[in-house]
Amino acid sequence: MNEKEIKQVFSDVQQRLDTLQGSDASFMFIGHQGNHFVISGKTNEISSQILFAMMRYPVIRDIIKECATRYDGLNAQYGSNVRNVKMDHLIEQNSGNEN
């Protein structure tokens, strides 16, 4: 995967999040270790919205999971608005709660 293709995946995810949460739901997928995913919103509130979107909408969770699988090794350090997300926990939270 080259940089252009990676940016396209991020753009696709961003568009879906914008549709779900409004234009302020900006995020960056930073990387993952095992099944822990690191995402960052512009603010803590937006990061929380992203986590909500991941739990509520399986398509968002699946896209972010795919990003993590395809782009292993992406890594960075950010401030307090970074969230570590354990995918097993999200799947467990979401199972049986689809309406």
Task: Name the predicted role of every residue range.
Residues 1-99:
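Solvent-exposed interaction surfaces and binding hotspots enriched for charged
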